[in-house]
Amino acid sequence: MSGTSLLSVERLAKSFGGVVAAREVTFTVEAGRLIAIIGPNGAGKSTIFNMVGGQLAPDSGRVVLAGHDITGLPPRRIWRLGLGRTFQVAQTFLSLTVAENVQMARSSVHGRTRAWWRPMQGLYRDEALDLLDRVGMAENADRPCSELAYGDVKRVELAIALAGAPKLLLMDEPTAGMAPKERAQLMALAAGIARERRIGVLFTEHDMDAVFGHADHVLVLVRGEIIAAGMAEAVRADPRVREVYLGGGAHALRRAAV
């Protein structure tokens, strides 16, 4: 891969008792590119995400974000240095409006933390509306998140993550729980935003259509170790990857190639 490296993961290792969750994992993420990590359940994907995001400290190795060594730093400090994140189960304040959710995120960026139950009124509303417009949710700005379809909540969560002006965005199974059409739309949206804003995106995903349709580079993780890495076509054809995805997974790989 070539370009501006935003994230450098260097020989990360993590074990839980006798179970190796990450074994000398090394990769980079660059500006404007989407990097997917795939693998069977228990492969270590969440462990790597949590070490990058600060929820777990590695046993050894190093994580560098935009020139800053963030290894073992707490999540909020890493967020301040330019890391945004969305989750497998979307995390929003359901009782607040769509706009208020994004306004709260913007107020945190500016150091103006507020209790979630206090009205946001006009604070950073214009900035919030701009972000909501970009993710296609401006018309729903004054609706409570509790009234939204789940696919729309995922879009709001993306706007919340963007409110922190991230250099790098971690997306943990971004299409989980969504209909096929919604999955394609969300991934196309994330890819477009990443390229226009020069944000690096690292995501995990079980939907192979989402992976091979949108990732610039694919990493395949098995038992904590990267067994294959490269462009979609090369990874899909790798015999080691096809062995891992025998059965339903292999069918998914073939279907994604169509």
Question: How does the language model describe each region?
Answer:
Residues 2-258:
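Glycine-rich phosphate-binding loops of nucleotide-dependent enzymes
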